[in-house]
Amino acid sequence: MRGAARVGVTRRPRALAAGCMCMVALIGCGSQAGSAASTQRQAIERYMGEVEPIRLAVNKLLGGADPILEAFRDRRIAPREAARRMGQLERRFAAYAVDIAAVNPPTAQLRALNAPYADTYVFEDAYLSALVAGLADDELTHLPNTQAAQRAAITRWRIGLTVLARAADAPLPADLQRAGRGEIAPAPSPNGS
């Protein structure tokens, strides 16, 4: 009888210990999943902290192109003056293109999203450079048409970023959903031609 009592006593602590170990393992798995989401959230927040000031500054800067083009179309400024003003805008934009290319996202997923997004700045800079030359020559019929490629890349960036942010419960700027939906390149004439 003594041996039987001893066996029962030994089994209970072992069973209890095994149960506790299983609970600890399950809690650990849950905290790892939470930890991964938290890490991804922090990565997204860091990335947006770098990208958002550039994106907003570019939006504001490009808003300055329309008054230049309107004045050119209405012949309130000469072609050379329009080219000079647009050239100043293009040089400021080129600095932002360098800034966005210098962003180093902390995760592979964000790097994969950022590379094509940064390429849209290259397209825009090339367009602005061609626009400057076209304004100087008073000839705007041969500008590169990169809007569709830019729009698609920006839309893929926005959607990919939204998917990652939802999975990590990370906040995104409220106006981000408009990215890629408006006018991409300043139109040299009111009808876009």
Which residues make up each language-model segment?
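Hydrophobic helical h-region of N-terminal Sec-dependent signal peptides
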Residues: 18-23
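Heptad-repeat alpha-helical coiled-coil/4-helix-bundle sensor or tether segments in soluble regions
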Residues: 115-128
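C-terminal amphipathic alpha-helix
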Residues: 37-89, 126-193
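Short, solvent-exposed, charged loop/turn and helix-capping segments
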Residues: 90-118, 133-137, 164-172
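Bacterial N-terminal signal peptides that target proteins for export
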Residues: 3-17
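Bacterial signal peptide processing site
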Residues: 30-32
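C-terminal motif of bacterial Sec signal peptides marking the signal peptidase cleavage site
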Residues: 26-28
